[in-house]
Amino acid sequence: MAKVITVLGSTNIDKVVSVPRFGVSGETLHTPNHQVEAMGGKGLNQGVAVARSAVKTNMITKVGKEFDTAKNMNVANLNTEHVMYSETEETGQAYITVSEETGDNIIYIYGGANADMTTEDVRAHTDAIKESDFVIAQLETSMETVIEGFKIAHENGVKTILNPAPMPEDGGLPAELLNLTDVIAPNEHETFLLTGIEVTDEHSMIDNAAYYFERGIDTVIITVGSEGAFYMRKDGAEGIVPSFKVKAVDTTAAGDTFIGAMSTRLNPNLDNLPEAMRYGAAASSLTVQRAGAQPSIPMEEEVLKVLEDNK
């Protein structure tokens, strides 16, 4: 189990509206409720998922000067000493529509202060990375900042976990970043954009994993929504961890919760990956039953109860 995890990534203010279903171009739909604001961003979601599973979490992120950190990041175990403030940009924004029909979402992001983070900003927080068992990053800050954070991690023997989302428009990631990544955790769509191999069955997931192994990554996790998650290590160990079957209300932050919660149970040598993934799946099953991003992320005791009830 990890003792300290650093999350390098985004903070957004989520503006969420429910719709009966997703419309088509030119169509107008009534919404059953007003727009709801909540804290989110893939980075902060993952950080909160780690913190709520009772592990110290260093949050390296950048927000606008207007952001009230004490209020908006008031989460036990979440260390906000590494939050930075942009002089020129406001806090990032995410505009989220959630289908009441399926619980699925569509998200549009304005980067704001997330895009203002620099490699110098990251390097200034080397101490946070050095004390960690894992560094987790996503792609809502610049590619350069993620590479810098992973360089620091590797310089200090810290394992790196990459959630390659949102994927760049060209569908590619720098070879340098892949080579600095110990664990990559895309979903089925993201891995298709990276590898060109569509996920249709376990054999195709193995083919996807081979692509990453050739580029220096030792451990691959591919999430496939309600079907669960596939894993494979370079030593040949592989399998599928099924999801917990629940009725989804809102899938926002489901993947972030899985990654953050899973990482808290991982041993630094990754020898308990399936067990850690099952913990992450249990946490994610709670998230999808609730509305919103950060508000939906469960506490450790809730996750442990799900595991106990599903032995």
For each feature predicted by the language model, list its residue ranges.
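Conserved phosphate-binding/catalytic region of the ribokinase-like
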Residues: M1, E202-K311
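Positively charged, low-complexity intrinsically disordered leader regions
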Residues: M1-S25
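Substrate-binding N-lobe of the ribokinase-like
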Residues: V4-I5, L29-Q93, V306-N310
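Glycine/charged-rich beta-loop-alpha catalytic/anionic-binding loops adjacent to active sites
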Residues: S25-H34, E238-V246
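Short beta-strand scaffold segments in enzyme catalytic cores
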Residues: V48, Q93-T97, I106, G228-M232
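Surface-exposed amphipathic alpha-helices with a cationic face
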Residues: A51, I147-E155, F213
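Conserved phosphate-binding/catalytic loop of the ribokinase/pfkB sugar-kinase fold
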Residues: M59, Y85-S86, I96-F134, L139
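Conserved phosphate/ATP/ADP-binding segment of small-molecule kinases
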Residues: E155-E238
